[in-house]
């Protein structure tokens, strides 16, 4: 699982002291070297640096080409620095997929032990807050109810976190999303990015997994990199793969058990 790659059309571009293309290139190299090969690669939004220009996605796809050459299925969500129409034009297989939610890019990735539900929280390009929306919440509820035989894992870009004042500045309709996933006990985890932070939490037994950014951090000591996810029947194991192998959380493994 990768998040917040923030790729510019210029592969030499630097932001916050980081060459984002170098970070993604290193992550891709590590993922393609995994043995056995992963069943899928998930990228959790903010694929592009700022406005989601066509050239951003051209460079992004060039950097991801080793994954595609290796035959690894690639699945994405969209974040606030993406442009949905430009993304669809760049990634032809995404453009050709069914669109069960009008104007949103959603997908279901099925595996032997769990089903993944990838949401679209892009509201307005290059504006920070995100929104799932009523139609997408209804679609998710229906899709979850139709697939209750396996654990369900939901991925969205924006952080579904309600602050002490009752507001959710990341995902504006966090409460509406939680109203869908919390009562459905076969939903075991909710993954998100956006904050460029690696963090684990729980709400009513639902695991909340904040993925680190591939690109750059906001806090000086925060890790950048990606997360290797191994699913089991009764839970999952997450391993942090830091860009800097000397980082204190590089190689950290967390075992998360499914709620009953």
Indicate where each model-derived feature is located.
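N-terminal active-site segment of His-dependent metallophosphoesterases
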Residues: 1-55, 149, 163
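Active-site glycine-centered loops adjacent to acidic/histidine catalytic or metal-binding residues
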Residues: 4, 45-46, 79-80, 157, ...
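Short, glycine/acidic-enriched loop or turn micro-motifs at the edges of active sites
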Residues: 7, 49, 123, 160, ...
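Extended active-site neighborhood of metal-dependent phosphoesterases/phosphodiesterases
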Residues: 53-147, 151, 173-186, 201-212, ...
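Short acidic, glycine-rich surface-loop motifs adjacent to enzyme active sites
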Residues: 145-164
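Histidine-centered catalytic micro-motifs
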Residues: 154-160, 188-198
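A short C-terminal boundary segment appended to hydrolase-like catalytic domains
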Residues: 230-260
């Amino acid at each position: 699982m990768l998040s917040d790659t923030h790729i510019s059309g210029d592969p030499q571009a630097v932001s916050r002291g980081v060459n984002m293309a170098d970070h993604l290139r290193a992550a891709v190299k590590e993922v393609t070297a995994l043995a056995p090969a992963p069943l899928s690669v998930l990228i959790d939004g903010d694929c592009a640096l700022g406005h989601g220009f066509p050239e951003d996605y051209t460079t992004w796809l060039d950097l991801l080409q080793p994954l595609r050459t290796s035959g690894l299925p690639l699945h994405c969500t969209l974040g606030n620095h993406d442009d949905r129409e430009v993304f669809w034009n760049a990634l032809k297989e995404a453009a050709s997929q069914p669109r069960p939610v009008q104007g949103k890019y959603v997908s279901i990735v099925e595996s032997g032990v769990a089903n993944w539900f990838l949401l679209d929280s892009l509201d307005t390009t290059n504006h920070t807050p995100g929104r799932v929306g009523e139609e997408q919440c209804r679609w998710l509820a229906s899709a979850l109810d139709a697939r209750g035989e396996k654990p369900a894992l939901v991925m969205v870009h924006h952080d579904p976190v309600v602050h002490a004042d009752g507001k959710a500045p990341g995902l504006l309709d966090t409460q509406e999303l939680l109203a869908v996933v919390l009562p459905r006990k076969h939903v075991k985890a909710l993954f998100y990015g956006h904050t460029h932070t690696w963090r684990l939490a729980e709400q009513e037994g639902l695991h909340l997994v904040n993925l680190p950014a591939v690109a750059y951090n906001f806090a000086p000591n925060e890790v950048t990199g990606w997360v290797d996810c191994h699913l089991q029947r009764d839970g999952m194991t997450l391993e942090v793969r830091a860009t800097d192998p000397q980082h204190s959380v590089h190689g950290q493994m967390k075992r998360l058990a499914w709620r009953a």
